[in-house]
Amino acid sequence: AAVHDAWLYVPYCWDNTNAAPDNVSSDFNGVRVPYVNWYHDVSNFGAYRDHIYGLMTYNVTDLYQTGVNNTALFAREGTDAKISPAGFTLAVVYEDSSATRKQIFINEEFDILGADQGNYGTSMAEATAYVPFSGAIIDTENVVRANLTTFVPWGNDGEGNLYFNGEQIGTGVWSYGPRAVGASDNPQVAVDEREVTAYLNATGNE
């Protein structure tokens, strides 16, 4: 199989010095790479209203090496800068003409969600992110299996309801593991994967 695409995703938090995107750098396999997309959000409420959370994405297709350990280095510029990355995600899409046909839809964005009327003034309905998928039409009659995989940085234990095409398919979905403050071996990124074949549409999946 040949590599079709390789993308590096770097989520971060605690950026109250506006370090991202221009005062941070990312190297992949020793080569400085520019970010392609930058998504960010801020609560604007409470004690941490000015602490920006975000996601930076990098196209590393030409630098990715199969069969070896690939390395990524994320650094801030300036000793007074405050920015804390979570675990990186490296998504690699392969193509193989001898394999069965696959359709892969990738939607990248970033939102801070918190449902708490007392502390944030937000309801469950307001603290909802919508993720529409666009692309080629799906031949639903011939689909063997469809999986939905979600990545949620700092998704706490028992947190999050998951819907697909209007159907609730999970409750308390995301948990990144033991809570940690400061330097940690925990990637602090919750990953969930589940089958959605029964709810799949030919177009307009969300």
What residues fall within each predicted segment?
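Short linear motifs in intrinsically disordered
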Residues: 17, 60-64, 153
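Solvent-exposed N-terminal domain segments of exported/luminal and surface proteins
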Residues: 1-25
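Helix-biased "structured C-terminal domain" signature
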Residues: 86-206
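Short alpha-helical "patches" and their helix-cap loops
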Residues: 20-30, 103-109
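Short, flexible beta-strand-to-coil junctions
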Residues: 11-15, 76-79, 151-157
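Cysteine-clustered segments with highest specificity for TGF-beta superfamily mature ligands
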Residues: 24-82, 86, 164-206
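Residues within well-ordered beta-strands of beta-sheet-rich folds
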Residues: 2-11, 55-63, 74, 87-93, ...
